[in-house]
Amino acid sequence: MRLEDLRPTPGAMKKRKRVGRGPGSGHGKTSGRGHKGQKARGSGKVHIWFEGGQTPLQRRLPKRGFKNINKKVYAVVNVKVLEERFEANEEVTPEKLIERKIIKDLKDGVKILGDGELTKPLVVKAHAFSKSAVEKIESAGGKAEVI
């Protein structure tokens, strides 16, 4: 076998379709677009959401709800995470939570939730607490302070 003997696998090199190049090509005159109509025209594309003139789905369905621009979005932390990542009598602040990569950013503040158990007394400073989180922090001998 020599370099000049190399040939592409049959079917690997597909010929380019040259449309509008006479009747002998098989793609002449109308260039494979058929006769007249929207799709035969230059800019005759239909959007993927076009439903043939019937009222589109997004207009058939009723309007519902709204997005509250004043809603607070908290970065949430569960009590079990505080148990794992902090020592007894340590102070937990939003800055320390970011520093230890427990949360990415503050958003509208930090909310402590009550999933898991807490055995160490901790001084937790956050923007909001759930009732169960406050109970667990205080029963472990710690303090829950709202910033």
Swiss-Prot record:
Subunit composition and interactions: Part of the 50S ribosomal subunit.
NCBIfam families per UniProt: rplO_bact
PANTHER family linked: 50S RIBOSOMAL PROTEIN L15, LARGE RIBOSOMAL SUBUNIT PROTEIN UL15M
UniProt protein name: Large ribosomal subunit protein uL15
Keyword rRNA processing applies: no
Bias-annotated ranges (Basic residues): 30-44
Region (Disordered) residue spans: 1-46
Species annotation: Thermotoga maritima (strain ATCC 43589 / DSM 3109 / JCM 10099 / NBRC 100826 / MSB8)
Cited SUPFAM superfamilies: Ribosomal proteins L15p and L18e
Short name of any one Pfam family annotated for the protein: Ribosomal_L27A
Lineage: superkingdom: Bacteria
Keywords, sorted A to Z: Ribonucleoprotein, Ribosomal protein, RNA-binding, rRNA-binding
Function, in words: Binds to the 23S rRNA.
GO cellular component: cytosolic large ribosomal subunit
Alphabetized GO MF terms: rRNA binding; structural constituent of ribosome
Keyword rRNA-binding among UniProt keywords: yes
GO biological process: translation
Family from the record: Belongs to the universal ribosomal protein uL15 family.
